Amino acid sequence: MAEETYAVLKTNLGDITVQLFPNHAPKTVRNFVELAEGTREWTDPKTGKPGSGPFYDGTIFHRIISGFMIQGGDPLGQGFGGPGYTFDDEIHPDLRFDKKYLLAMANAGLRGGKGTNGSQFFITVSTPAHLNGKHTIFGEVVDDASKKVVDEIGTVRTGAGDRPVQDVVLQSVTIERRQA
Protein backbone atom coordinates (compact mmCIF):
# COMPACT_ATOMS: atom_id res chain seq x y z
CA MET A 1 0.00 0.00 0.00
CA ALA A 2 1.18 3.47 -0.85
CA GLU A 3 1.40 6.17 1.76
CA GLU A 4 -0.33 9.49 1.17
CA THR A 5 0.63 12.69 2.94
CA TYR A 6 -1.89 15.24 4.17
CA ALA A 7 -1.59 18.55 5.97
CA VAL A 8 -4.32 19.83 8.27
CA LEU A 9 -4.16 23.61 8.47
CA LYS A 10 -5.98 24.61 11.65
CA THR A 11 -7.16 28.21 11.37
CA ASN A 12 -9.30 30.40 13.60
CA LEU A 13 -12.03 30.03 10.94
CA GLY A 14 -11.86 26.22 10.69
CA ASP A 15 -9.65 23.41 9.43
CA ILE A 16 -8.37 22.95 5.88
CA THR A 17 -7.21 19.45 4.90
CA VAL A 18 -4.85 19.28 1.94
CA GLN A 19 -3.41 16.24 0.19
CA LEU A 20 0.24 16.86 -0.68
CA PHE A 21 1.87 15.73 -3.95
CA PRO A 22 5.33 14.35 -3.07
CA ASN A 23 5.58 12.44 -6.37
CA HIS A 24 5.15 15.64 -8.37
CA ALA A 25 7.00 18.13 -6.16
CA PRO A 26 9.23 16.16 -3.75
CA LYS A 27 11.52 19.00 -2.64
CA THR A 28 8.62 21.38 -2.12
CA VAL A 29 6.57 18.87 -0.13
CA ARG A 30 9.60 17.92 1.97
CA ASN A 31 10.27 21.61 2.70
CA PHE A 32 6.64 22.26 3.70
CA VAL A 33 6.42 19.13 5.87
CA GLU A 34 9.72 19.77 7.63
CA LEU A 35 8.84 23.41 8.33
CA ALA A 36 5.40 22.36 9.59
CA GLU A 37 6.85 19.69 11.88
CA GLY A 38 9.75 21.85 13.04
CA THR A 39 12.40 19.41 11.80
CA ARG A 40 14.03 21.74 9.27
CA GLU A 41 16.49 24.47 10.19
CA TRP A 42 15.24 27.99 9.54
CA THR A 43 16.24 31.51 10.41
CA ASP A 44 13.90 33.76 12.35
CA PRO A 45 13.53 36.85 10.13
CA LYS A 46 12.82 39.03 13.17
CA THR A 47 16.07 38.19 14.95
CA GLY A 48 18.34 36.66 12.30
CA LYS A 49 18.94 33.77 14.70
CA PRO A 50 18.12 30.08 14.20
CA GLY A 51 14.45 29.35 14.71
CA SER A 52 13.09 26.28 16.42
CA GLY A 53 9.84 24.40 16.44
CA PRO A 54 7.00 24.35 13.95
CA PHE A 55 7.48 27.25 11.55
CA TYR A 56 3.88 27.97 10.51
CA ASP A 57 2.19 27.89 13.92
CA GLY A 58 0.72 31.29 14.78
CA THR A 59 1.34 32.88 11.38
CA ILE A 60 -1.46 34.60 9.50
CA PHE A 61 -2.98 34.59 6.06
CA HIS A 62 -1.48 37.97 5.23
CA ARG A 63 -2.82 38.39 1.69
CA ILE A 64 -6.31 37.57 0.50
CA ILE A 65 -7.59 38.48 -2.93
CA SER A 66 -11.28 37.73 -3.33
CA GLY A 67 -11.94 35.52 -6.34
CA PHE A 68 -8.24 34.62 -6.67
CA MET A 69 -6.36 33.18 -3.67
CA ILE A 70 -5.49 33.17 0.03
CA GLN A 71 -1.80 33.45 0.96
CA GLY A 72 0.10 32.59 4.12
CA GLY A 73 3.39 31.24 5.39
CA ASP A 74 5.19 34.51 6.13
CA PRO A 75 6.42 34.64 9.74
CA LEU A 76 6.44 38.45 9.53
CA GLY A 77 2.88 38.57 8.23
CA GLN A 78 3.79 41.19 5.63
CA GLY A 79 4.53 39.24 2.45
CA PHE A 80 8.32 39.36 2.38
CA GLY A 81 9.36 37.07 5.24
CA GLY A 82 10.57 33.51 4.92
CA PRO A 83 12.74 30.78 6.42
CA GLY A 84 16.11 32.31 5.52
CA TYR A 85 16.69 30.30 2.35
CA THR A 86 15.13 29.86 -1.09
CA PHE A 87 14.82 27.02 -3.57
CA ASP A 88 13.84 26.47 -7.19
CA ASP A 89 10.41 25.71 -8.59
CA GLU A 90 9.29 22.17 -9.35
CA ILE A 91 6.91 22.67 -12.25
CA HIS A 92 5.25 19.37 -13.16
CA PRO A 93 3.53 19.05 -16.55
CA ASP A 94 0.59 17.12 -15.06
CA LEU A 95 -0.27 19.90 -12.61
CA ARG A 96 -1.90 23.06 -13.93
CA PHE A 97 -4.00 25.83 -12.44
CA ASP A 98 -7.12 24.46 -14.11
CA LYS A 99 -9.24 23.99 -10.98
CA LYS A 100 -9.88 25.67 -7.65
CA TYR A 101 -8.41 24.75 -4.27
CA LEU A 102 -4.83 24.03 -5.35
CA LEU A 103 -1.96 24.55 -2.90
CA ALA A 104 1.07 26.23 -4.46
CA MET A 105 4.23 28.08 -3.50
CA ALA A 106 4.17 31.86 -3.51
CA ASN A 107 7.37 33.36 -4.88
CA ALA A 108 8.90 36.52 -6.31
CA GLY A 109 9.85 34.98 -9.67
CA LEU A 110 13.43 34.22 -10.60
CA ARG A 111 16.28 36.24 -9.11
CA GLY A 112 19.66 35.76 -10.73
CA GLY A 113 18.28 32.68 -12.48
CA LYS A 114 17.34 31.08 -9.16
CA GLY A 115 13.95 30.32 -7.65
CA THR A 116 12.59 32.33 -4.73
CA ASN A 117 10.41 29.74 -2.99
CA GLY A 118 10.77 29.62 0.78
CA SER A 119 7.81 29.18 3.11
CA GLN A 120 4.99 31.24 1.63
CA PHE A 121 2.14 29.39 -0.03
CA PHE A 122 -1.29 30.10 -1.43
CA ILE A 123 -4.54 28.24 -2.06
CA THR A 124 -6.50 29.17 -5.16
CA VAL A 125 -10.19 30.06 -5.12
CA SER A 126 -10.25 30.38 -8.92
CA THR A 127 -8.46 28.89 -11.93
CA PRO A 128 -5.55 31.31 -12.53
CA ALA A 129 -4.08 29.85 -15.74
CA HIS A 130 -1.65 32.78 -15.97
CA LEU A 131 0.28 31.19 -13.07
CA ASN A 132 1.07 27.98 -14.99
CA GLY A 133 4.81 27.42 -15.16
CA LYS A 134 5.49 30.13 -12.56
CA HIS A 135 4.44 28.55 -9.26
CA THR A 136 4.93 25.02 -7.92
CA ILE A 137 1.65 23.23 -7.25
CA PHE A 138 2.22 20.78 -4.40
CA GLY A 139 -1.20 19.90 -3.02
CA GLU A 140 -4.97 20.15 -3.21
CA VAL A 141 -7.78 20.77 -0.73
CA VAL A 142 -9.59 17.44 -0.42
CA ASP A 143 -13.01 17.78 1.18
CA ASP A 144 -16.06 20.00 1.00
CA ALA A 145 -15.79 21.21 4.61
CA SER A 146 -12.21 22.37 3.95
CA LYS A 147 -13.23 24.05 0.69
CA LYS A 148 -15.93 25.91 2.59
CA VAL A 149 -13.29 27.22 5.02
CA VAL A 150 -11.08 28.32 2.11
CA ASP A 151 -14.06 30.10 0.55
CA GLU A 152 -14.85 31.82 3.85
CA ILE A 153 -11.26 33.00 4.24
CA GLY A 154 -11.28 34.11 0.61
CA THR A 155 -14.10 36.55 1.26
CA VAL A 156 -12.96 38.21 4.49
CA ARG A 157 -12.80 41.99 4.45
CA THR A 158 -9.38 43.31 3.47
CA GLY A 159 -7.61 46.63 3.60
CA ALA A 160 -4.38 48.00 2.13
CA GLY A 161 -2.16 45.43 0.44
CA ASP A 162 -4.98 42.86 0.41
CA ARG A 163 -4.35 42.27 4.12
CA PRO A 164 -7.34 41.08 6.15
CA VAL A 165 -8.80 43.71 8.46
CA GLN A 166 -9.03 41.03 11.17
CA ASP A 167 -6.28 38.41 11.35
CA VAL A 168 -6.95 34.97 9.92
CA VAL A 169 -4.56 32.91 12.03
CA LEU A 170 -2.91 29.66 10.98
CA GLN A 171 -2.86 28.17 14.46
CA SER A 172 -1.05 24.97 13.49
CA VAL A 173 -0.20 22.62 10.64
CA THR A 174 -0.39 18.91 11.40
CA ILE A 175 1.09 16.41 8.95
CA GLU A 176 -0.71 13.08 8.58
CA ARG A 177 0.59 10.03 6.76
CA ARG A 178 -2.17 7.66 5.68
CA GLN A 179 -2.22 4.36 3.85
CA ALA A 180 -3.89 4.73 0.44
Task: Please report, for each region that a protein language model flagged, where it lies by residue.
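Cyclophilin-like peptidyl-prolyl cis-trans isomerases
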Residues: 1-180
